[in-house]
């Protein structure tokens, strides 16, 4: 006798009246009801979903970056390799996501822009924490989060804590590499800047990668990550220019001009310079 239509479909469970479903597990009711357009314009939904999904990916990036930093701090490098590789692949995902937002034309964005107020991706506290964990620190960037104590404290902690790269240098110092004293203990709220003793240590690693394999692998994971981050920043600039030209950003920055300056930021300067010096 044939089962009634809808019952026993490929032996899949179909009744979730007493068990957790896919939607329950993912809290889809909350997620899919978190989009609240402020304009009547059809295209605002794209704008909201683009930024919300980016924030979800950044949540995962932070999960991986914090764990990787802890691994390096605790002298356990191998697990960090997978975590950093995952962050790079997330960045690849975010690079491709700009293609979707780029379907919004200038007139479409102009129709909804008045409804955005002063809100801007510049104010993302998760993005700011990512920048700080990667060493691009600027204490002035705490101010946009002062109105939300929990966000402010989270970002401030990242500002005042050694970056992932700082922890790598400290790891190397614990394992016999020589550094200037201020590379090991300093004001961690200051951004990473080039240091000759740091480059010398990494050059030693790169000149004998077999002997220093774990550090060599870590360094290449850093380069992979910064490479992906640079691509994301470039697509950000070109997408913004394509949609709004050189208008000022909603958050008050000079828009494309500001984003172009960010292209010059180098997160791991010694790892790039040594390629010339090898």
From Swiss-Prot:
<feature type="binding site">
    <location>
        <position position="109"/>
    </location>
    <ligand>
        <name>substrate</name>
    </ligand>
</feature>
<protein>
    <recommendedName>
        <fullName>Tryptophan 2,3-dioxygenase</fullName>
        <ecNumber>1.13.11.11</ecNumber>
    </recommendedName>
</protein>
<keyword id="KW-0560">Oxidoreductase</keyword>
<keyword id="KW-0823">Tryptophan catabolism</keyword>
<comment type="pathway">
    <text>Amino-acid degradation; L-tryptophan degradation via kynurenine pathway; L-kynurenine from L-tryptophan: step 1/2.</text>
</comment>
<comment type="similarity">
    <text>Belongs to the tryptophan 2,3-dioxygenase family.</text>
</comment>
<feature type="binding site">
    <location>
        <position position="250"/>
    </location>
    <ligand>
        <name>substrate</name>
    </ligand>
</feature>
<dbReference type="GO" id="GO:0004833">
    <property type="term" value="F:tryptophan 2,3-dioxygenase activity"/>
</dbReference>
<keyword id="KW-0223">Dioxygenase</keyword>
<feature type="binding site">
    <location>
        <position position="113"/>
    </location>
    <ligand>
        <name>substrate</name>
    </ligand>
</feature>
<dbReference type="GO" id="GO:0019441">
    <property type="term" value="P:L-tryptophan catabolic process to kynurenine"/>
</dbReference>
<dbReference type="GO" id="GO:0046872">
    <property type="term" value="F:metal ion binding"/>
</dbReference>
<dbReference type="GO" id="GO:0019442">
    <property type="term" value="P:L-tryptophan catabolic process to acetyl-CoA"/>
</dbReference>
<dbReference type="InterPro" id="IPR004981">
    <property type="entry name" value="Trp_2_3_dOase"/>
</dbReference>
<keyword id="KW-0408">Iron</keyword>
<dbReference type="GO" id="GO:0020037">
    <property type="term" value="F:heme binding"/>
</dbReference>
<feature type="binding site" description="axial binding residue">
    <location>
        <position position="236"/>
    </location>
    <ligand>
        <name>heme</name>
    </ligand>
</feature>
<dbReference type="Pfam" id="PF03301">
    <property type="entry name" value="Trp_dioxygenase"/>
</dbReference>
<feature type="binding site">
    <location>
        <begin position="47"/>
        <end position="51"/>
    </location>
    <ligand>
        <name>substrate</name>
    </ligand>
</feature>
<keyword id="KW-0349">Heme</keyword>
<comment type="function">
    <text>Heme-dependent dioxygenase that catalyzes the oxidative cleavage of the L-tryptophan (L-Trp) pyrrole ring and converts L-tryptophan to N-formyl-L-kynurenine. Catalyzes the oxidative cleavage of the indole moiety.</text>
</comment>
<keyword id="KW-0479">Metal-binding</keyword>
<dbReference type="InterPro" id="IPR037217">
    <property type="entry name" value="Trp/Indoleamine_2_3_dOase-like"/>
</dbReference>
<dbReference type="InterPro" id="IPR017485">
    <property type="entry name" value="Trp_2-3-dOase_bac"/>
</dbReference>
<comment type="subunit">
    <text>Homotetramer.</text>
</comment>
């Amino acid at each position: 006798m044939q089962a009634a239509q809808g019952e026993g479909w490929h032996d899949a469970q179909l009744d979730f009246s007493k068990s957790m479903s896919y939607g329950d597990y993912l809290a889809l009711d909350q997620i899919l009801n978190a989009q609240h357009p402020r304009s009547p314009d059809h295209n605002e939904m794209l704008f909201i979903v683009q930024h919300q999904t980016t924030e979800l990916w950044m949540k995962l990036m932070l999960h991986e970056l914090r764990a990787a930093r802890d691994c390096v701090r605790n002298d356990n490098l191998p697990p960090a390799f997978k975590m950093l590789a995952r962050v790079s692949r997330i960045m690849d995902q975010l690079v491709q996501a700009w293609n979707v937002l780029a379907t919004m034309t200038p007139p479409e964005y102009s129709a909804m822009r008045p409804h955005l107020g002063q809100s801007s991706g510049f104010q993302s506290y998760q993005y700011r924490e990512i920048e700080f964990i990667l060493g691009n620190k600027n204490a002035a960037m705490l101010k946009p989060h002062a109105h939300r104590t929990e966000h402010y404290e989270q970002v401030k902690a990242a500002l005042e804590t050694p970056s992932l790269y700082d922890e790598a240098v400290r790891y190397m110092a614990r394992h016999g590499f020589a550094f200037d004293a201020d590379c090991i203990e300093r004001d961690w709220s200051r951004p990473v800047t080039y240091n000759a003793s740091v480059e010398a240590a990494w050059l030693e690693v790169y000149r004998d990668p077999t002997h220093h394999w774990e550090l060599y692998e870590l360094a290449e994971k850093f380069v992979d990550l910064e490479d992906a981050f640079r691509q994301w920043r470039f697509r950000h600039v070109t997408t913004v220019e394509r949609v709004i030209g050189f208008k000022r950003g909603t958050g008050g920055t000079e828009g494309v001009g500001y984003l172009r300056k960010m292209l010059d930021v180098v997160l791991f300067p010694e790892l790039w310079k040594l390629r010339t010096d090898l």
